[in-house]
C-alpha cells in the first residue's frame, strides 16, 4: 500500500464519516514515523552535505551543542574537505552521511550549511538502516532535497537553522525553536496577521522548503506527493520572473491543486530585470494559488532570514489563519 497516496475510501473502511481532508490527516498520522526527542548525553553528527565550510566558524556552534545542550558531537570528514565549491567529493560527503545514518549511537545529523550539492548524493545513499533507527536530519535551503527524499520514506526531518548560523546576531529565536523540537518540547507558533492572508483552517502533514529545490526534485526519486499536505515555501536571491516560472511549474505539475494549506516564508533579496517583472514574490504566489480555496499565510518566519523557525517536515500539523493572527500547532505524541 502506498501510504503517501491513501485510498479515498480509507475513512469509510474505518466506519467514520469524515471530510476528505480529515481522512487524509488521520491516515497520515497513523502511518507517519515520529522521531523521539534527543536527550542530554546523546551523540549527534555534524557534516557538510553541500558546499565547503570554514571549520573555524563551526567551533562556537560545536561548543554550544556540547556545553549548553549537553551533546556529544561526531565530526564528519566533509567539514575539513574541499573539492571545488563542495565540501569534498561526492564520495566523501556521501560516506559521511551514510556513516551517520547507520551509526545507532548518533541520534541526529546536522548539516553545517547549505549551498548546492545535496541532491548529488541521494541516489548513492542506502536508507535501510535509517528506516529502522529513526533520527533527525537537520538543515534548510539546499538540504530541502534531503527533506523531500526522507519524506518519500514517510519519516520526519527538520527544516531549521544550521550550525554555521547558530550564533548569528539576533538569531536566538531560531536557535531556541530548533532546540525545542530536538528535545521534544511543545512548539506552537503564533504570528501576527498579514494583509494578504487567506483565512481558513487546515490539518495535514507539513512539507516544503526552498522553492527552487522543490521544483528541482520534481520527476526524480525524491519527488513527493503534495495531496492533502500543508506546503511551506521560501527562497533567496531569485529573479522575480524565475519565482513566477517555478510557481507555474508547481501548478502545471499538479502540486498545488490538492493542498490543504500554504505557508509563505521569506523570499529574500529578490532580483529584477531592467524592465521590472511587475509583481512582488508574494503577489506572484498569490496569483498562482488564486483559484484554490485553502488557507494561505504570508510572512511566516522561515527561510534565509534571522528568524528561521524550526519546522518538522512530515509532521501532522494544524494551521489556523484568522483575522487576528496565525497559529501553527503540531502533534507531539511520540512512539
Regions found by a protein language model. Give the residues of each.
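ATP/NTP phosphate-donor binding region
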Residues: 27-105
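Conserved beta-alpha junction segments in alpha/beta enzyme cores
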Residues: 53, 57, 205-236
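N-terminal glycine-rich "phosphate-gripper" loop used for MgATP/nucleotide binding
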Residues: 108-119
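Short, acidic/small-residue loops that bind anionic groups at enzyme active sites
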Residues: 127-149, 156-162
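Conserved anion/nucleotide-ligand pocket segment
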Residues: 156-213
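Internal helical hairpin/lid segments
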Residues: 225-281
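ATP/nucleoside-binding phosphotransfer catalytic cores, i.e., glycine-rich phosphate-binding loops
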Residues: 269-335
Amino acid at each position: 500500500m502506498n501510504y503517501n497516496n491513501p485510498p479515498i475510501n480509507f475513512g469509510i473502511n474505518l466506519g467514520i464519516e469524515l471530510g476528505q481532508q480529515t481522512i487524509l490527516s488521520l491516515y497520515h498520522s497513523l502511518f507517519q514515523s515520529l522521531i523521539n526527542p534527543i536527550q542530554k548525553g546523546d551523540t549527534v553528527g555534524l557534516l557538510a552535505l553541500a558546499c565547503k565550510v570554514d571549520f573555524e566558524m563551526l567551533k562556537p556552534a560545536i561548543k554550544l551543542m556540547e556545553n549548553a545542550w549537553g551533546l556529544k558531537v561526531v565530526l564528519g570528514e566533509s567539514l575539513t574537505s574541499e573539492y571545488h565549491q563542495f565540501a569534498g567529493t561526492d564520495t566523501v560527503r556521501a560516506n559521511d552521511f551514510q556513516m551517520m545514518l547507520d551509526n545507532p549511537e548518533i541520534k541526529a545529523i546536522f548539516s553545517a550549511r547549505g549551498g548546492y550539492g545535496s541532491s548529488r548524493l541521494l541516489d548513492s545513499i542506502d536508507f535501510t538502516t535509517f528506516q529502522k533507527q529513526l533520527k533527525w536530519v537537520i538543515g534548510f535551503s539546499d538540504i530541502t532535497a534531503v527533506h523531500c527524499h526522507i519524506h518519500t520514506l514517510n519519516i520526519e526531518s527538520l527544516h531549521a537553522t544550521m550550525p554555521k548560523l547558530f550564533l548569528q546576531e539576533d538569531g536566538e529565536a531560531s536557535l531556541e525553536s530548533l532546540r525545542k523540537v530536538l528535545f521534544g518540547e511543545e512548539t506552537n507558533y503564533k504570528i501576527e496577521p498579514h494583509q494578504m492572508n487567506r483565512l481558513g483552517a487546515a490539518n495535514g502533514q507539513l512539507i516544503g522548503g526552498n522553492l527552487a529545490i522543490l521544483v528541482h526534485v520534481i520527476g526524480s526519486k525524491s519527488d513527493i506527493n503534495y495531496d492533502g499536505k500543508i506546503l511551506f515555501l521560501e527562497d533567496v536571491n531569485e529573479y522575480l520572473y524565475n519565482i513566477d516560472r517555478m510557481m507555474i511549474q508547481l501548478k502545471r505539475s499538479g502540486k498545488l491543486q490538492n493542498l490543504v494549506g500554504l505557508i509563505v516564508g521569506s523570499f529574500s533579496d529578490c532580483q529584477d530585470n531592467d524592465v521590472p517583472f511587475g509583481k512582488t514574490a508574494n503577489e506572484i504566489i498569490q496569483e498562482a494559488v488564486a483559484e484554490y480555496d485553502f488557507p494561505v499565510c504570508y510572512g511566516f518566519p522561515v527561510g534565509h532570514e534571522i528568524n528561521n523557525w524550526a519546522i518538522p517536515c512530515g509532521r501532522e500539523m494544524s494551521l489556523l489563519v484568522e483575522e487576528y493572527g496565525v497559529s501553527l500547532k503540531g502533534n507531539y505524541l511520540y512512539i
